[in-house]
């Protein structure tokens, strides 16, 4: 029977509980020398007290983590212009910079912060001397300033300054790449601390590890968090009743719902792209098999039927098929099942094992854990050509989760004999580590766009 439960002692209700300002600390482990140079000039602060957040530093870090940009260090900037009229275009183009972000911040009478910022096309500005003209509505030539890609003003409350910095990063990223930025997203993950009264904790943080919140704690294991497409809920596995069960929890209200509690194993929940179904794994018939569960009709449908183990389902972005890991060929490899016809195809052939697969939102690439002579590492496979690229050199990689724009991957690895979260750009150029200061971190799940 499906049960609706309030979390009670397991979840701290209302606003999510603040565990630490930044329990996950980003440490860059590999550079991006071939990335596109960009200038993020420190914003001018027109006040006497320190700002609650260094907006320009947050933006520079965001853009660097994408793997597509290499921000110029502040100590190597030829100047610090605070608006486009002060930009010396020749000075920046000599550094290879073709885009520059600058701005200013002041505080209004209500105590809020007024942020004025501009993204400048440095190359265009150099070509026109910042004085390009266009025909106005009356047919007269007017100054067009088409080297200013955007010029925006926003009023922001102090506690939301860091969030708004991510918003600016998204705008810059989309303007310069044509793709949506994913800096205003979150990650969910499980932290294990054997010395804590509740050693298993499900937490949520900004994608960069800041603003970490505790959403659930338990004396029994928690596993496999997965986001709903609207970013409101998490599906996860709990052992609180003595066996693996699947729950869905609203992370804002604290309400949760038990979905499955079949004999033996219930695991690996994953929302469908439309949010109407869960793919999951049950072993009620013996071996692990993939099922779908309709969240409206409560209908359970078996997808795989074999003597082998089939697990780790993940929906194709079009919702018409699932990929999953199976040992039907002897060792774990990744397969794809068409939900209409039931036909199954093997996707991975390189490496002795491939598991934990996810497909990028555009459907082009399969990201998975690939086992070779060098160990378990993240790899990316082109689904059209079959070409394989190993993305990481970390130890015992597992549980990859792709950003909603397909640009980055967060995963669990081993560092200093402890599970930590790591991050790699989808092209493998940028790598970082997000080590927790208070436990072993596993099973990351990247949120949808929020």
UniProtKB/Swiss-Prot annotation:
Segment forming the signal sequence: 1-22
Main location: periplasm
Matching InterPro entries: 6-blade_b-propeller_TolB-like, PD40, Tol-Pal_TolB, TolB_N
Alphabetical list of SUPFAM superfamilies matching this protein: TolB, N-terminal domain (SSF52964), Tricorn protease N-terminal domain (SSF69304)
UniProtKB keywords: Cell cycle, Cell division, Periplasm, Signal
Pfam family for this entry, one: TolB_N
Subcellular location: Periplasm
GO biological process per UniProt: cell division; protein import
Keyword Signal among record annotations: yes
The protein's assembly and partners: The Tol-Pal system is composed of five core proteins: the inner membrane proteins TolA, TolQ and TolR, the periplasmic protein TolB and the outer membrane protein Pal. They form a network linking the inner and outer membranes and the peptidoglycan layer.
HAMAP family named among the record's database cross-references: TolB
Summary of the function given for this chain in its UniProt record: Part of the Tol-Pal system, which plays a role in outer membrane invagination during cell division and is important for maintaining outer membrane integrity.
Full protein name: Tol-Pal system protein TolB
Species this chain originates from: Vibrio parahaemolyticus serotype O3:K6 (strain RIMD 2210633)
């Amino acid at each position: 029977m499906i049960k609706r439960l309030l979390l009670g002692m397991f979840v701290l209700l209302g606003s999510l509980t603040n565990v630490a300002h930044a329990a996950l600390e980003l440490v860059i482990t590999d550079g991006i020398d071939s990335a596109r140079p960009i200038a993020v000039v420190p914003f001018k602060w027109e006040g006497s007290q320190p700002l609650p957040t260094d907006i320009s530093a947050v933006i520079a870090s965001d853009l660097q983590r994408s793997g597509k940009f290499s921000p110029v260090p502040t100590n190597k900037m030829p100047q610090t212009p605070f608006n486009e009229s002060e930009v010396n275009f020749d000075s920046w183009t000599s550094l290879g910079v073709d885009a520059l972000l600058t701005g200013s911040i002041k505080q209004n009478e209500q105590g809020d912060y007024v942020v004025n910022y501009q993204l400048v096309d440095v190359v265009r500005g150099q070509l026109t001397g910042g004085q390009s003209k266009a025909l106005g509505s009356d047919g007269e030539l007017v100054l067009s300033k088409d080297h200013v890609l955007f010029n925006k003003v926003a009023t922001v409350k102090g506690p939301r300054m860091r969030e708004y910095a991510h918003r600016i990063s998204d705008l810059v990223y989309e303007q310069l790449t044509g793709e949506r930025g994913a800096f205003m997203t979150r990650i969910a993950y499980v932290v294990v601390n054997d010395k804590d009264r509740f050693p298993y904790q499900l937490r949520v943080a900004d994608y960069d590890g800041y603003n970490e919140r505790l959403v659930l704690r338990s004396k029994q294991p928690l596993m496999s968090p997965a986001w709903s497409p609207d970013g409101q809920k998490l599906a996860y596995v709990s052992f609180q009743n003595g066996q693996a069960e699947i729950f869905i929890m609203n992370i804002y209200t604290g309400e949760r719902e038990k979905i499955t509690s079949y004999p033996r194993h219930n695991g690996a929940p994953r929302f469908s792209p439309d949010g109407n179904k869960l793919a999951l794994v049950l072993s009620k018939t013996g071996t692990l098999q993939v099922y779908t569960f309709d969240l409206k009709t409560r209908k359970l449908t078996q997808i795989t039927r074999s003597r082998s183990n089939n697990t780790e389902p993940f929906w194709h972005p079009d919702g018409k098929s699932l990929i999953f890991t199976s040992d039907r060929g002897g060792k774990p490899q990744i397969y794809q099942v068409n939900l209409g016809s039931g036909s199954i195809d093997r996707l991975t052939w390189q490496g002795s094992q491939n598991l934990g697969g996810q497909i990028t939102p555009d459907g082009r690439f399969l990201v998975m854990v690939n086992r070779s002579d060098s160990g378990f590492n993240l790899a990316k496979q082109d689904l059209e050509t079959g070409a394989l690229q190993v993305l990481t050199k970390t130890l015992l990689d597992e549980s990859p989760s792709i950003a909603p724009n397909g640009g980055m991957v967060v995963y669990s690895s081993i560092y200093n004999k402890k599970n930590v979260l790591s991050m790699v750009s989808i092209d493998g150029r940028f790598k970082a580590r997000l080590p927790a200061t208070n436990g072993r971190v596993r099973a990351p799940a990247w949120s949808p766009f929020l």
